[in-house]
């Protein structure tokens, strides 16, 4: 996993502490788009561009929000190739029909946009990236911030009414999103990229302890924060939809398959079958990326055949309607 140091690309490995625990670096770009005009970035249809990977759960959050809010015409999108090699994310539409080119600066690699935004940038080159076409700058590269902006700030240009952050539930949404981040969203990476047995064991214990907790929680209500789909569910969904196809095998998160959790599994099916969400899920990109982009985890790049999943299968969550 490379990174940029003072604007220069380095392929040096990073990510673990001295005890073998995977450490995720904080994102750097944190500006906000405000509907009230109180920031340097006002809401304007056509001004902003979203860079994503269809494989990445963090980027997937933002693509779902864009779809649920009907922002396809207001915010354009580019998709990187699923393979993340030594040069990290790359634009290669010639090699994959679901990948695109870069319309902003004609970049071959995503890191070129980071260098354009900050010639002295030091940090990881990650998706999602919310780009301002007008100034040629990165507005934000934190998935939770972008999800929140798409949820709350773009009402004037949205074509669908879908409140992912209802005022009455905001404190609970924030609490739940915080609660699932370390053990589940980042927990699968803590397990998969652990450099010691102790670090792996700790991550797996945290992960499945949290899954057990939310399995019980979802036995009494349809969604994480009650009866409506919110940002917290989007953050949970993008991890769960990758669990059996990838994390269970590739990241050795295999105490149980998600399919063995009846409430979590049916909850996953329920969200997947929500209008406009299924089309944001690309299992080919997901499996190809993980199995072929992490040589320290899977040196031969062999893509596992299973587990087979049917996300269109009937679910039982209507019992809470």
Predicted regions and their residues:
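C-terminal alpha-helical interaction module
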Residues: 1-321
